[in-house]
């Protein structure tokens, strides 16, 4: 029995040593394979053409650049495109297959079936405050309304830029704007915004803090207001609380993968006058408004030219946002 026990122990020890040797051999082999694989990647990477999201390439040329209608262009096999449109467009077209028709037309421009998504919205104002932009490239169709031209330009500013906003309690606190990128954004069915600038003793400058009738009116009965006041000065603010909300917002920079197509209107809205829009660049496409089918056909024709002045899902804040008009 003693000899059998020793033999068993010896067998176990030999098995452990052999297993350890096999595992070390496998580990060394895998290390060798991984090393050769990484070395191969390092050698071929300079020759592989891939997108660079960190480089800022400014776009030069005429502000009224002419876009050529072309069927040739980049093959967007790995990109997605979202087209946002007002619900009225779908109602006017009244065709259950219209999205499939457009998908087939986008296919002729290099966009594979399934890469283009269509999403309607009921109210552009609500959409602009928190736009859900899901795709690599996002194109928003915005119908021009001559009764709210100012609102439209501010809506475009909200959609084309990233904003960080926080609620304001104007009944308890004074507020000041810290920089040109800091704005107060009011939205509602009826927004009348009044402000009273304060001195260092919190006394009103040209107004009485206890009398809102002496406040300066910066907006009256509007649906959307982006208020810009003198930086570094406290203000007491008054708004119609029952019909309006106000938030303290900071413009972080442009959404480079977003473009707006203005549908109709005599002129394209100019948002580049805002000193926080950097650089001062605008690309305009001018086509007469007819029917929604005509609008969508035009978008299909020029989609690749529009995409070329956008950045795919870029997070850089250096380049311009672009505003288009049909």
From Swiss-Prot:
Q: Where does Ca(2+) 2 bind?
A: 177, 228-229, 301
From the UniProt record, which GO molecular function terms apply?
metal ion binding
Please tell me where this protein is predominantly located: virion
Subcellular localization, as worded in the UniProt entry: Virion; Host endoplasmic reticulum lumen
Would you identify the family this protein belongs to, as annotated?
Belongs to the rotavirus VP7 family.
Miscellaneous notes: Some rotavirus strains are neuraminidase-sensitive and require sialic acid to attach to the cell surface. Some rotavirus strains are integrin-dependent. Some rotavirus strains depend on ganglioside for their entry into the host cell. Hsp70 also seems to be involved in the entry of some strains. In group A rotaviruses, VP7 defines the G serotype.
Q: Which HAMAP family match?
A: Rota_VP7, Rota_VP7_A
What is the name attached to this protein's record?
Outer capsid glycoprotein VP7
Q: Which organism is it from?
A: Rotavirus A (strain RVA/Human/Japan/KUN/1980/G2P1B[4]) (RV-A)
Lineage of origin: Viruses, Riboviria, Orthornavirae, Duplornaviricota, Resentoviricetes
């Amino acid at each position: 029995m003693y000899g059998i026990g020793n033999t068993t122990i010896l067998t176990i020890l030999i098995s452990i040593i052999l297993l350890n040797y096999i595992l070390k051999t496998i580990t060394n082999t895998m290390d060798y394979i991984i090393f050769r694989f990484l070395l191969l990647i390092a050698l071929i990477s300079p020759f592989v053409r891939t997108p660079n999201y960190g480089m800022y390439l400014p776009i030069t040329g005429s502000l009224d650049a002419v876009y050529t209608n072309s069927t040739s262009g980049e093959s967007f096999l790995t990109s997605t495109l979202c087209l946002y449109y007002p619900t009225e467009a779908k109602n006017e077209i009244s065709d259950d297959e219209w999205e499939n028709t457009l998908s087939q037309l986008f296919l002729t421009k290099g966009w594979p079936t399934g890469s283009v998504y269509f999403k309607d919205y009921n109210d552009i104002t609500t959409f602009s405050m928190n736009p859900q932009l899901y795709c690599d490239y996002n194109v928003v169709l915005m119908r021009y309304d001559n009764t709210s031209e100012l609102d439209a330009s501010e809506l475009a500013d909200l959609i084309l830029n990233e904003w960080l906003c926080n609620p304001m309690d104007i009944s308890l606190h004074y507020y000041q704007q810290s920089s040109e990128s800091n704005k107060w954004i009011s939205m509602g069915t009826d927004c009348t915004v009044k402000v009273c600038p304060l001195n260092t003793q919190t006394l009103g400058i040209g107004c009485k803090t206890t009398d809102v009738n002496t406040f300066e009116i910066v907006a009256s009965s509007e649906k959307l207001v982006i208020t810009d006041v003198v930086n570094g000065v406290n203000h007491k603010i008054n708004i119609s609380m029952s019909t309006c909300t106000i938030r303290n917002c900071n413009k972080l920079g442009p959404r480079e993968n977003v473009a707006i197509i203005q549908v109709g209107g005599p002129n394209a809205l100019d948002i580049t006058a805002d000193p926080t829009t950097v650089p001062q660049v605008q690309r305009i496409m001018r086509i007469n408004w007819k029917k929604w089918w005509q609008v969508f056909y035009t978008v299909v024709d020029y989609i690749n030219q529009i995409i070329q002045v956008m950045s795919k899902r870029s997070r850089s804040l250096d380049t311009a946002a672009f505003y288009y008009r049909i």
